[in-house]
A protein has these predicted regions:
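N-terminal leader/targeting segments and the first structural element of proteins
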Residues: 43, 76-77, 82, 91
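Hydrophobic residues in beta-strands and at strand termini
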Residues: 46-47, 92, 142
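A conserved, well-ordered hydrophobic junction motif at loop->secondary-structure transitions
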Residues: 47, 51-65
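Active-site helix/loop of acyl-thioester processing domains in fatty-acid/polyketide metabolism
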Residues: 61-79
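Conserved interaction-surface patches within small, structured recognition/assembly domains
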Residues: 83-95, 101-109, 121-124
Length: 194
């Protein structure tokens, strides 16, 4: 019996589709792209099925939307399949209420050789008043995959505006911090094991 995904789709078929997309992506030009080429905006009405025991929208629902939007932006930039490598920062600033419309905006901030950092901003809109509140922000890192599921090179990024250049500079700082933190933890563990 073959495996099925959550929606009943045979996983073997999905895996072959991913491999085919990766093969096609490998043939893509690696010419740099601007952030606008991969920007994503998702919107979703928040109903009772998404509520936590406090009556607000469960944070996990927001996190799933963030990962989805960021993954689409990264995949657009890479021109093929990507996987979430890390959630670098996640901030919940204000609750989202049942009845709100959630707007999730994702754009590529910077790229490495095989990695893509995507910034995400979440806003909740009160339908009756139209008032929007910035509720969450996150930075995620994705890795582009080839047909064997191995990391593959991604196109460069060409910021076009001062805001995009600012985001890219901040992304480089976050990357430096991630690498320094990983190295400090590795050294600490080596000391404990010695």
């Amino acid at each position: 019996m073959s495996e099925s995904g959550a929606d009943g789709t045979p996983l073997d078929g999905l895996r072959e589709q991913v491999r085919e997309a990766a093969r096609a992506a490998a043939a893509h030009d690696l010419a740099p792209k601007p952030p606008r080429a991969s920007e994503v905006t998702l919107s979703q009405h928040m109903d009772l099925s998404r509520a936590n025991i406090m009556g607000n929208v469960h944070g996990g629902e927001i996190m799933k939307m963030i990962d989805t939007a960021a993954g689409i932006a990264a995949s657009r930039h890479a021109g093929g399949p990507v996987v979430t490598a890390s959630l670098d920062q996640m901030s919940f600033l204000h609750p989202v209420h049942v009845g709100d419309v959630v707007l999730v905006r994702a754009s590529v901030n910077d790229v490495g050789r095989t990695s893509i950092e995507v910034g995400v901003r979440v806003e909740a809109e009160e339908i009756l008043s139209g008032r929007r509140t910035h509720t969450s922000s996150a930075y995620l890192v994705f890795v582009a995959l080839d047909e064997r599921g191995q990391p593959r090179p991604v196109p460069g990024l060409v910021p076009e505006t001062d805001v995009e250049r600012h985001r890219q500079a901040e992304a480089k700082i976050r990357r430096e911090h991630r690498l320094a933190s990983a190295e400090a933890i590795r050294r600490r563990r080596d000391q404990l094991e010695a």
